[in-house]
Amino acid sequence: MKIIAKKDLFINDEIRVREVRLVGLDGEQLGIKPLSEAQAIADDANVDLVLIQPQATPPVAKIMNYGKFKFEYQKKQKEQRKKQSVVTVKEVRLSPVIDKGDFETKLRNGRKFLEKGNKVKVSIRFRGRMITHKEIGAKVLAEFAEKTQDIAIIEQRAKMDGRQMFMQLAPIPDKK
């Protein structure tokens, strides 16, 4: 059953059609009934008559407890929002002539970001005449990728953009 937003649902007295295809409480088909008879059946069961498919011919109405239905729907929406994870891109900036200790610190930070599930953009900024030695920058990026290959995959290979060379790493998805 496709869930429709409240503004599209018609309940009990809001329904303005002559006859409906009626679906019972347990989902069983009760056939095509006049609206008055369908409302009487819903009243006898002490529940609501909800028009769930107004475009169908004849429109489909279901006998259900609308309050409970609305609560379950909101609960499901809340669960879906909880399950959504926001992936952010963190940046680690390096230099083509980076010292070993500095490189290890940047590598440790990059690994922390990846372990938390974030993507990491590793960028190298070329200053002055360093731009003539792009291979040194590529070597630094390759070393960074090699040392994080156990927890990350290369999402975007090293490429130049102006005076910067960058690559993007993503955490390895969990294998379930």
Curated annotation (Swiss-Prot):
Q: What's an example Gene Ontology biological process for this entry? A: ribosome disassembly
- A Pfam family cross-referenced in the UniProt record is IF3_N
**Compartment list:** Cytoplasm
Q: Gene Ontology cellular component? A: cytosol; membrane
* Source species, domain of life: Bacteria
Where in the sequence is the signal peptide annotated? Answer: none
Presence of keyword RNA-binding: no
Which SUPFAM superfamilies does the entry mention? Translation initiation factor IF3, C-terminal domain (SSF55200), Translation initiation factor IF3, N-terminal domain (SSF54364)
GO terms (molecular function) for this protein are:
ribosome binding; translation initiation factor activity
Cited InterPro entries = T_IF-3_C_sf (IPR036788), T_IF-3_N_sf (IPR036787), Translation_initiation_fac3_CS (IPR019813), Translation_initiation_fac_3 (IPR001288), Translation_initiation_fac_3_C (IPR019815), Translation_initiation_fac_3_N (IPR019814)
Q: What is its main location?
A: cytoplasm
Answer whether the UniProt record assigns the keyword Membrane to this protein.
no
**Which keywords belong to this entry?**
Cytoplasm, Initiation factor, Protein biosynthesis
Cross-referenced PROSITE patterns: IF3 (PS00938)
Q: Which family does it belong to?
A: Belongs to the IF-3 family.
Function field: IF-3 binds to the 30S ribosomal subunit and shifts the equilibrium between 70S ribosomes and their 50S and 30S subunits in favor of the free subunits, thus enhancing the availability of 30S subunits on which protein synthesis initiation begins.
Task: Provide the assembly information.
Answer: Monomer.
Q: What is this protein called?
A: Translation initiation factor IF-3
